[in-house]
Design a protein with these regions (language model features):
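Conserved AMP-binding A3 loop
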Residues: 30-34, 153-180
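Conserved pre-ATP/AMP-binding loop-to-beta segment of ANL
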Residues: 16-18, 139-157, 164, 190-198
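Gly/Ser/Thr-rich phosphate-binding loop
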Residues: 243-246, 258-362, 457-460
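Conserved AMP-binding/adenylate-forming core of the ANL superfamily
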Residues: 20-65, 69-73, 90-95, 173
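Conserved AMP-binding/adenylation subdomain of ANL enzymes
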Residues: 176-198, 205-302, 315
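Conserved ATP-binding/catalytic segment of the ANL
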Residues: 370-437
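Structural core segment of the AMP-binding/adenylate-forming
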Residues: 49-50, 73, 77-148
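Conserved C-terminal "lid"/linker of ANL adenylate-forming enzymes
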Residues: 460-463, 470, 498-554
Length: 554
């Protein structure tokens, strides 16, 4: 049975039970298995009536919603290749990806976005608004088309080191394996039970990991609640009351910071107990416990931790974290509160996942062992190589880049890492220049650096930083001796604002630091070809970079 057949089967089993939810205006709106099948069928009728057929490609440009999920399933059920796009992406970038993938039709939520696409791409294919897709009369649901393992299911765009997004081609075989493996891990985490597991979800479905969670949740006995307003995430969590929550490091770090600030503001006994309990927990993890640690932990567990857990989510049993490595102290923080944090690791090219924590053997700071059926090894330079049925088939219309990434059956991830004696992997850095923010967004620095340099003729070099951080920042070097006097904060800020105006939110530069002297070969910060030695630069200016982020976050 394919992943799609499993989903349709589970929806039939959950005919009268809620399977998907949206949160709007402090109310939870649910659809049952039967209701979701019905709107999927409406969408399928729309597709067939427009002459769309197996192998065609369609772009799906909308924020998360029940209708997004239904259209995605309808497209796949008809054998149509889905090209999901990020709704908050700059219109010019969206058009570039659609020109590359040549969709037969574009599905869009917003008429204003549709108009912008037509303005930038007058020859664009027909654009259909989601509202019109579901205007038809309901009819009896029919089974999905059967997919062979080699059938293309989706093309998901991911940033490359050149800055030009590449379409990652994923097949039915890729998704079949990952959904099965993810279900296996979730079975260990959630265990057998008669009631549906409640899962909360906010990351855009155009991200591979987010999409895989959607498919996995629909293929099992669960209720997936979708966030619709990030500004109200805390309130939505209380309404959904989930047991499990997929998130990224940035969010967990914000929650941690908010809790610590709240404790500090309370004063009194709380400010005495909490930091000491936290230090005691870290020492216990490191097997360095001191006399009195048990007392501080007991006080924390009896007087503080239960209330904090309830404020995060009264029913929360575990957090699942991916998209970027999670700081070990943040993972330990939530474990101290009694909320396990499981990590997963993967890329779009690995169909989102290649490692996942075993709930019974979580090691903080590690992302778990390879999932069943997937092989991983460490190359001589420390790069992580992956092989298995989850590996993408190709980069869309990029044979040279495909050949470079896939060598002798092994996918070269561009990440550095190492396994421990238990087979759990630790991610240690990036081989490539690609910056991965804590939000999980992948950003090629070169195009943004080039644009900033164009607006800063006084600068010698511009270097973007932000790997495993919450936002981008820049190091800007002055042009020539005593150049610090020629390059002002106002000039840099003006250039940043100009460039930011054409960038999506996650590609915007939020802070900068002026370096008085240019980087040179002699200083060890440029190669003999004049290229930036990024690792050396970030190491040399580690203190300045840390101060930059601390100042911006305070």
């Amino acid at each position: 049975m394919t992943f799609l057949e499993s989903i349709f089967s589970q929806l039939n089993k959950s005919a009268t039970e809620p399977v998907l939810q949206e949160i709007h205006h402090e109310k939870v709106h649910s659809v049952t298995g039967n209701e979701l099948l019905a709107i999927i069928q409406q969408a399928r009728h729309f597709l067939v009536a427009r002459g769309l057929k197996k192998g065609d490609r369609c772009a799906l440009l909308a924020p998360n919603s029940i209708r997004w999920a239904a259209l995605d399933l309808a497209l796949m059920a008809e054998g149509i290749v889905v090209v999901p796009l990020y709704a908050r992406q700059a219109p010019a970038e969206l058009v570039a990806m659609m020109r590359d993938s040549t969709p037969s039709r574009i599905f869009c939520l917003d008429a204003a976005v549709a108009a912008e696409i037509k303005k930038l791409w007058p020859q664009a294919p027909q654009i259909s608004l989601l509202e019109g897709v579901y205007a038809g009369e309901p009819s009896t649901p029919t089974p999905p088309m059967h997919h062979e393992d080699g059938d293309v299911i989706s093309i998901i765009y991911t940033s490359g080191t050149s800055g030009e997004p590449k379409g990652v081609v994923l097949t039915a075989g890729n998704v079949n394996h990952i959904v099965s493996a993810t279900n296996s891990r979730l079975d260990k985490l959630m265990g057998p039970r008669t009631e549906a597991d409640r899962i909360f979800h906010y990351a855009p479905f155009c991200f591979a990991a987010s999409w895989i969670l959607l498919l996995t949740a629909l293929s099992r006995h669960s209720i997936l609640a979708l966030s619709t307003d990030l500004a109200k995430l805390s309130d939505e969590l209380k309404l959904a009351a989930p047991e499990y929550f997929l998130n990224v490091p940035t969010l967990l770090e914000r929650v941690r910071a908010r809790i610590q600030t709240t404790v500090q503001e309370r004063g009194g006994l709380a400010t005495a107990i909490f930091p000491r309990a936290q230090q005691a927990f870290v020492r216990r993890h490191n097997k360095q416990s001191k006399f009195g640690d048990s007392l501080w932990l007991a006080l924390g567990n009896s007087l503080m931790f239960p209330a904090i857990r309830k404020s995060i989510g009264p029913n929360l049993k575990a957090l699942i974290c991916g998209s970027a490595p999670l700081a070990i102290d943040t993972q330990l923080f939530f474990m101290m509160l009694g909320i396990p944090v499981l990590q997963v690791y993967g890329l779009t090219e690995t169909t989102a996942i290649c490692t996942a924590d075993d709930p019974a053997h979580v090691e903080p700071g590690f992302v778990g062992p390879a999932i069943p059926g997937v092989e991983m090894k460490r190359a001589d330079d420390g790069e992580i190589l992956v092989r298995g049925p989850n590996i993408f088939s190709e980069y869309w219309q990029r044979p040279a880049e495909t050949a470079k990434a896939l060598q002798d059956g092994w996918f070269h991830t561009g990440d550095q890492g190492e396994p421990n004696e238990n087979g759990n992997w630790r991610i240690t850095g990036r081989i490539k220049n690609l910056i991965i923010l804590n939000s999980g967004h992948n950003i090629a620095p070169e195009p943004i650096e080039e644009k900033l340099a164009q607006h800063l003729p006084e600068a010698q070099q511009v270097v973007l930083i932000g790997n495993q951080r919450g936002f981008l920042a820049a190091l800007v070097t002055s042009n020539g001796a005593n150049g610090a006097n020629k390059l002002t904060d106002q000039q840099i800020q003006s250039a940043i604002e100009t460039v930011n105006a054409s960038q999506p939110h996650y590609k915007q530069v939020r802070a900068f630091h002026i370096v008085p002297e240019p980087f040179t070969m002699e200083s060890g910060l440029l190669t003999t070809m004049g290229k930036l030695k990024r690792d050396a630069i970030t190491q040399r200016f580690a203190a300045e970079i840390e101060a930059l982020y601390q100042k911006k976050s305070s």
